[in-house]
Amino acid sequence: MATDQKRGLLIVFEGLDRSGKSTQAKRLVESINKKSTESGDASSSPSAVLQAFPDRSSSIGKLIDQYLRKEIDMDEHALHLLFSADRFSKNQMIRDNIAKGIDVICDRYCYSGVAYSLAKGLPEQWVRSSDVGLPKPDAVLFFDVSPEVAAQRGGFGEERLETATIQQKVAAVMPTLRDDAYWKTVNADGDLDSVEKNVFRIYENLDREKPFESLEKI
């Protein structure tokens, strides 16, 4: 990394299914790249990239996608490790982009993996250990919406984990994963534009000067 170039940021969007996080993650990437272009940045590289987890286009992600779409069944322990493997497959990509000064915006990350596996009753210590060593986010934006409101939004129920019972359990687990040092709560009940402005305010106040770290615990 050039000495005069600040590193990129790793920002994670988390929340229940249909909480609006995917839409807002895309909007943040678009806003960052638009602002960079308007400021006269002549670089051919984007200023921000979006990474969704699972990556359903990868070989690992395709298996996960088949499970989520109810096309295949799978042991829950194997599924948890597949989700972790999917994230680790992007480990170097994330680190390389951060080193180049490119922000990486993740639609879900290890916290979803932990929350869903705990909601399904897998052993806590084992579940929490499988993602240790991944890049540590500079911020986790948790989209706060009730399971009841999320269930009323379009598309809910199309995939295996989109059930009221699982979503309620995940909603109960997520706060136990929170680290106030870098977790931020976003009220997801507002309109798209107001939520987007709130997200961008959080983004603009993040610190690029602090060292980039790896997760030591979850």
Curated annotation (Swiss-Prot):
Name of the molecule in the record: Thymidylate kinase
Organism: Caenorhabditis elegans
Top EC class of this enzyme: transferase
InterPro entries: P-loop_NTPase (IPR027417), Thymidylate_kin-like_dom (IPR039430), Thymidylate_kin_CS (IPR018095), Thymidylate_kinase (IPR018094)
A Gene Ontology BP annotation from the UniProt entry: dTDP biosynthetic process
Enzyme Commission number, as recorded: 2.7.4.9
Annotated HAMAP family: Thymidylate_kinase (MF_00165)
The keyword Nucleotidyltransferase belongs to this UniProt entry's keyword annotation: no
Designated gene of the protein: dtmk-1
